[in-house]
């Protein structure tokens, strides 16, 4: 993920996982704009295969307006994650939801009530079996 502080004139890469991983979702805490959450997705597609997830997929948090990032994955599945959608509760910004695509045993909707300190699985289902739908 790239960040600009001068209206887009200059950019700095602030969250670089690997060449197969990008940021697919980012949300900002409306009560504290220094706090951001980003979902990364590792995928690899070539003529022989499509891998919908990998070790680069995760959720990250910044507490300094996106200058630095750290992974917040306690309680999330340990298998390779697929695409992730993230939402902050409009009533309480310490509550965050993550819809995570992965295998049927581990994928689903996860919730944190402590700003990403730990996650609890709330649902076994995200969407149909035809790919990410967030």
Regions picked out by a protein language model, each given a short descriptive name:
Residues 1-134:
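Beta-propeller blade termini and top-face loops
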């Amino acid at each position: 993920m790239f960040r600009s502080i001068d209206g887009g004139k200059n950019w700095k890469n602030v969250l670089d996982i690997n060449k197969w991983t990008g940021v697919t979702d980012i949300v900002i805490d409306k009560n504290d704009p220094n706090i951001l959450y980003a979902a990364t997705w590792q995928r690899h597609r070539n003529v022989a295969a499509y891998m919908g997830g990998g070790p680069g997929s995760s959720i990250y948090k910044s507490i300094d307006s996106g200058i630095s990032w750290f992974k917040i994955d306690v309680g999330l599945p340990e298998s390779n994650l697929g695409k992730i959608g993230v939402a902050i509760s409009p009533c309480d910004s310490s509550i965050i939801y993550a819809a995570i695509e992965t295998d049927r045993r581990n994928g689903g909707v996860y919730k944190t009530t402590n700003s990403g300190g730990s996650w609890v699985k709330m649902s076994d289902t995200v969407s149909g079996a035809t790919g990410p739908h967030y």
